[in-house]
Amino acid sequence: MGRSELELKTILITGASRGIGAEVATQLADRERHVIVNYREKTRRANDIVKAIRDSGGNASDARADLCDEGATAVMFDDIARLFGRLDVLVLNASGGLERGADPGYAMRINCDAQERLVRLALPLMPPGGRIVFVTSHQAHFLGRRPVPADYVPVAASKRAGEDALRAMGPILEANGISLVVVSGDMIDGTITVRLLEQRDPDAVAARRAVAPLPTVSEFARAIVRGIQEPVQDGQTIYVGGPDYLD
């Protein structure tokens, strides 16, 4: 690896082999950045995203790691340290809990415990001016203030717990010169989350569509990219869709 590559801005996006994470990765394609596409098991999809970024003139690589596996995530960050020497941006996009057959504790492990662990692993690699972007949903962000579809409650509660855990790390992040941005969206059209909810509770999805058109994957990804690139106030939340949540 040449010295010029070591000087690129390095961005790790979790859950980036498909959906929102993949779209964020492709929107970030640039000669001045190196995008690391994290994925759990969809190797071909991750490779396709990396190839698309490279074909457009950007720089990218993949990093396979189950975020609930402490050993695998530690190895992933060791590899980032060895290959790039630092991590400028951590995008916490991966989440779960609606999958068929998921055990009752999985949502909390992936949406809260893993998120906090990733930040603690990333901190030693992040220079002052680095940024952490936490991706969530309005149903989680506004938990307790707005109704939540019954099937989504465990996910919403775990994602809210994850956001709270990261915000509680504010003094540590500030001491290291790291900013935290939260990007919250209504149900995002075309995502696996909405497809699973439509199977379990179609009325809940229809109710959200009745309020306003659901944001698309591309629209939501653009908001995440803004959260990465633009000057923002530390701890700021960027909202996408769901105008009734903001009344």
Language model region names:
Residues 43-44, 63-76, 112:
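The beta1-alpha1 cofactor-binding region of Rossmann-like NAD(H)/NADP(H)-dependent oxidoreductases
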Residues 95-101, 131-175, 187-189:
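Catalytic loop of short-chain dehydrogenase/reductase
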Residues 101-119, 123, 129:
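Catalytic Tyr-X3-Lys loop
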Residues 76, 91, 118-122, 126, ...:
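Hydrophobic positions on the long internal alpha-helix
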Residues 178-183, 199-247:
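C-terminal helical subdomain
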Residues 31-48:
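Conserved glycine-rich Rossmann-like NAD(P)H-binding loop of the short-chain dehydrogenase/reductase
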Residues 14, 87-95, 111, 134, ...:
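Rossmann-fold scaffold of SDR-type NAD(P)-dependent oxidoreductases
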Residues 17-19:
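Conserved glycine-rich cofactor-binding loop
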